[in-house]
UniProtKB/Swiss-Prot annotation:
Transmembrane segments: 12-32, 69-89, 91-111, 130-150, 158-178, 183-203
One Gene Ontology molecular-function label: proton channel activity
Function: Subunit a, of the mitochondrial membrane ATP synthase complex (F(1)F(0) ATP synthase or Complex V) that produces ATP from ADP in the presence of a proton gradient across the membrane which is generated by electron transport complexes of the respiratory chain. ATP synthase complex consist of a soluble F(1) head domain - the catalytic core - and a membrane F(1) domain - the membrane proton channel. These two domains are linked by a central stalk rotating inside the F(1) region and a stationary peripheral stalk.
Homology family: Belongs to the ATPase A chain family.
Protein's cellular compartments: Mitochondrion inner membrane
Quaternary structure, from the entry: Component of the ATP synthase complex composed at least of ATP5F1A/subunit alpha, ATP5F1B/subunit beta, ATP5MC1/subunit c (homooctomer), MT-ATP6/subunit a, MT-ATP8/subunit 8, ATP5ME/subunit e, ATP5MF/subunit f, ATP5MG/subunit g, ATP5MK/subunit k, ATP5MJ/subunit j, ATP5F1C/subunit gamma, ATP5F1D/subunit delta, ATP5F1E/subunit epsilon, ATP5PF/subunit F6, ATP5PB/subunit b, ATP5PD/subunit d, ATP5PO/subunit OSCP.
Matching InterPro entries: ATP_synth_F0_asu (IPR000568), ATP_synth_F0_asu_AS (IPR023011), ATP_synth_F0_asu_bact/mt (IPR045083), F0_ATP_A_sf (IPR035908)
Name of the featured protein: ATP synthase F(0) complex subunit a
Keywords for this protein: ATP synthesis, CF(0), Hydrogen ion transport, Ion transport, Membrane, Mitochondrion, Mitochondrion inner membrane, Transmembrane, Transmembrane helix, Transport
GO annotation terms (biological process): proton motive force-driven ATP synthesis; proton transmembrane transport
Pfam families named in the record: ATP-synt_A
A cellular-component GO term for this protein: proton-transporting ATP synthase complex
Ion transport in keyword set: yes
Length: 220
């Protein structure tokens, strides 16, 4: 039994070896490997069609290259909602490790391809002369804050949802022998919250990749 509510966010270890890498690679094993049997297997054909339609509708604003990153983040977020599982994307270090390199790549790409336009983002057009130093500092700070906002947003939303689910589940378990009716209502609230967390897990993965795509479009 957990000693406190935050134990669920501790990285699992086996013989002192962190298993966060295994937890991150697990969603890739769920992807089916294309074979010739797909041509005669109606179930796999239907599954492939559904995944394709779902991906196109949900990830339509994203470019094709961002689909796989959105799907892997979505898989990590959704698998973390299962009982007795670990959610790697609740770790701020992991999210910052994803956000900072991708953001830095967009900035360096803009400086290499169109340095004048990339630096021009730091100074809006028509700025009064007296405000130029202040606005350059403000725009530079807002540019540097972007990766931190990406990582903290993903971590905070998932962590808050997991904590709230654990609190409600604990309340339902404690109330069951004393007030079964209240415990049943609490379980219903937990079920509705789980549906909400599924939506949040999908939306947060989508927002993470969408913002990176927008940052890339600014510098291309």
């Amino acid at each position: 039994m957990s000693l406190n509510f935050f134990d669920q966010f501790m990285s699992p270890t086996l013989l002192g070896v962190p298993l966060i890498a295994v937890a991150m690679m697990f969603p890739w094993t769920l992807l089916p490997t294309p074979t010739n049997r797909w041509l005669n297997n109606r179930t796999l054909t239907l599954q492939n069609w559904f995944i394709g339609r779902f991906t196109n509708q949900l990830l339509q604003p994203l470019n094709t290259g961002g689909h796989k990153w959105a799907m892997i983040l979505m898989s990590l977020n959704l698998l973390g909602l299962l009982p007795y599982t670990f959610t790697p994307t609740t770790q701020l270090s992991l999210n910052m490790g994803l956000a900072i390199p991708f953001w830095l790549a967009t900035v360096l790409l803009g400086l290499r391809n169109q340095p004048t336009a990339a630096l021009g983002h730091l100074l809006p057009e028509g700025t009064p002369t007296l405000l130029i130093p202040i606005l350059i500092i403000i725009e530079t700070i807002s540019l540097l804050i972007r990766p931190f906002a990406l990582g903290v947003r993903l971590t905070a939303n998932l962590t808050a949802g997991h904590l709230l689910m654990q609190l409600i589940a604990t309340a339902a378990f404690v109330l069951l022998p004393m007030m079964p009716t209240v415990a049943l209502l609490t379980t219903l609230v937990l079920f509705l919250l789980t549906l909400l967390e599924i939506a949040v897990a999908m939306i947060q993965a989508y927002v993470f990749v969408l913002l990176l795509s927008l940052y890339l479009q600014e510098n291309v």
